[in-house]
């Protein structure tokens, strides 16, 4: 299948023209060097872009602007940001049970964090577009082209499957649209009921080896819910939840094809350019070159943007990202996602925060405790230890508390499945256990139990 519309490509309707200024900025951005891009035929990719330019978007401007408003609250210390989901989504796992399980886990974490923080938790999933991954090498250990995500090539260790195929751009769109549709349905129906989600958390406390530690907090949430019921509180917010969609803006052929110009009447009287493949997009550690296409592309779009900052980030470089990506000092526009590693975060993060805070910009500070703590197990699996993940979050909180700044959120790779990919946690997963259910298409994820355990631990940090 090469497209999802029944009109020949040469008859597809053109997009509304951009203003001269926007067109110039976009063309300039796309002309810059872009790393980590597929090596497919440019003409074939252009044909697929033409298809994607005509399809309904995955998100709409009003939703994106609503998220930006909620993120402004995070930037101002009035809310907390929880972002999580699969490291890499796959077409084969884009199923109702898998999506439901991931959404359920994110909702369970959010309830615990909301109570711990005593403030709203903004929920953003890695969903409906996380189909591409940067890789450290173009070739894998078998001499095949590296798997770069289902948007680009296949996972099977086969030369034909590993060829970069631009028709996968449209398959990615079709899968993203289906996932987004299901997520909207699930979160507006009974799955998001606060009482139901808390009952799942009670089950976790009852069955987890570490449950006794979290019994008191779960009991407090129980009493709070009982109090609201006794008072007759029946707000719609207790039955539904809003979860926004995010992915790494990596494959520029996909992102540029999903650009749409807003109706000025919908966006404060000004036509804005949105990447409507998602609500929120981030730039990865490997693609954040200041002179590169990814940063320049992010400058042009009106979506909220994140930037991953690893241990090589200097305070001066962080300030440059802030000035480039948040030129109007708009709270909610920019999230700085730090991924330093648990043994470096306490040393490297303070000068970065101090330098950025001195600019007066209100950015969101978010901790990614996953990517700086990856290692190879004795059994040959890429893994992460739960204790190191928790320690990086703890270090992140310690730094912010010392500086008087707001630890704005966490960004984690999780799944609603009972996989064995990360070591430790209350289940005490060991190197020899990893082979049992090691199912990730890329990096190791926290399973449901580990995700909830992390949420309870972060809730304790939020209360301290």
Swiss-Prot record:
A single cellular component GO annotation: plasma membrane
Residue positions binding phosphoenolpyruvate: 126, 285-286, 308, 339
GO term, biological process aspect, one: amino acid biosynthetic process
GO molecular function: 3-deoxy-7-phosphoheptulonate synthase activity; manganese ion binding
Pathways involved: Metabolic intermediate biosynthesis; chorismate biosynthesis; chorismate from D-erythrose 4-phosphate and phosphoenolpyruvate: step 1/7
Keywords: Amino-acid biosynthesis, Aromatic amino acid biosynthesis, Cadmium, Cobalt, Manganese, Metal-binding, Transferase
Catalytic activities: D-erythrose 4-phosphate + phosphoenolpyruvate + H2O = 7-phospho-2-dehydro-3-deoxy-D-arabino-heptonate + phosphate
Keyword Cell membrane part of the UniProt annotation: no
InterPro entries linked: Aldolase_TIM, DAHP_synth_2
SUPFAM superfamilies reported for this sequence: Aldolase
Cofactor note: Binds 1 divalent cation per subunit. The enzyme is active with manganese, cobalt or cadmium ions.
E.C. number(s) listed in UniProt: 2.5.1.54
Cofactor (UniProt): Mn(2+); Co(2+); Cd(2+)
Binding site for Mn(2+): 87, 371, 413, 443
Enzyme class: transferase
Assembly, per entry: Homodimer. Probably interacts with MSMEG_5536.
Entry function: Catalyzes an aldol-like condensation reaction between phosphoenolpyruvate (PEP) and D-erythrose 4-phosphate (E4P) to generate 3-deoxy-D-arabino-heptulosonate 7-phosphate (DAH7P) and inorganic phosphate.
Family: Belongs to the class-II DAHP synthase family.
Name listed for the protein in its UniProt record: Phospho-2-dehydro-3-deoxyheptonate aldolase AroG
Organism of provenance: Mycolicibacterium smegmatis (strain ATCC 700084 / mc(2)155)
Upper lineage: Bacteria, Bacillati, Actinomycetota, Actinomycetes, Mycobacteriales
